[in-house]
């Protein structure tokens, strides 16, 4: 069997037997281009530019993505506190990705597309059980799926506070390095932690029309109920802007997810 494979490779690809044997022993890596791969490749890119140790395994890095990101980051680093990076600590799976001089911290976020959304650390996509525990409802709701309408009612009644918690956990570091459109042509957005908190105090906030109440729409084609989602807005009339999106997942991972729209974080 092995001989037939070697012969097929040499005949098809016009390579030597030695090259064919090497290809069998070490097939080329195939990258999934997932959000995780992009994020780890971006972290590797920052480490490469700053000449610091990277703890990410080589087989988890997409070299093409890393080099593409290095290309847009290199002319940027001399103008920002990025040049003060001392070490990469993202491998700890905490809120901080890089430690800077003077005790400052940096978080790295990547988006596959330019119109992506950013999920807060720690509280952005908890399971139903974790959500209930965090917001003090576990004794009442017990992490059960059928109580999603109660969870959404709580969010609506405490929306300003809820969004402030989400915002605090998005800017849990002194700086946020945001790299959108990594799937094609990445760009660089360097955001500083807001000087004034809480941000959401008395703004007019609203949900997408027709999505103000929790409901699961029946999908006739799929013969099942759809997951509920709704967008939250700030302002009125022409000043109305998207803030973020809530999603209630009920599949293999049952969770309450919230993500900020990129344009809100970069402009608010």
Locations of regions flagged by a protein language model:
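Nucleic-acid endonuclease domains
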Residues: 1-104, 109-268
């Amino acid at each position: 069997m092995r001989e037939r494979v070697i012969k097929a490779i040499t005949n098809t690809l016009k390579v030597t037997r030695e090259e064919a044997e090497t290809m069998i022993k070490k097939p080329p890596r195939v990258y999934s281009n997932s959000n995780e791969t992009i994020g780890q490749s971006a972290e590797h890119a920052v480490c490469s530019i700053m000449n610091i140790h990277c703890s990410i395994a080589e087989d988890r890095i997409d070299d093409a993505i890393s080099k593409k990101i290095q290309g847009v980051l290199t002319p940027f680093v001399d103008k920002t506190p990025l040049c003060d990076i001392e070490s990469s600590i993202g491998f700890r799976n905490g809120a901080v990705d890089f430690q800077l001089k003077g005790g400052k911290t940096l978080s790295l976020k990547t988006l596959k597309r330019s119109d992506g959304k950013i999920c807060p650390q720690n509280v952005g996509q908890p399971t139903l059980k974790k959500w209930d525990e965090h917001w003090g409802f576990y004794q009442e709701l017990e992490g059960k799926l059928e109580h999603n309408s109660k969870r959404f009612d709580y969010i609506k009644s405490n929306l300003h506070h809820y969004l402030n918690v989400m915002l605090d956990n998005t800017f849990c570091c002194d700086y946020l390095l945001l790299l959108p459109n990594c799937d094609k042509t990445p760009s660089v957005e360097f955001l500083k932690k807001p000087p004034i908190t809480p941000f959401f105090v008395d703004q007019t906030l609203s949900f997408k029309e027709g999505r103000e109440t929790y409901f699961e729409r029946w999908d006739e084609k799929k013969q099942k109920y759809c997951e509920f989602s709704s967008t939250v807005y700030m302002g009125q009339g022409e000043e109305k802007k998207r803030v973020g999106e809530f999603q209630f997942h009920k599949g293999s991972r049952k969770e309450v997810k919230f993500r900020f729209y990129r344009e809100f974080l970069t402009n608010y």
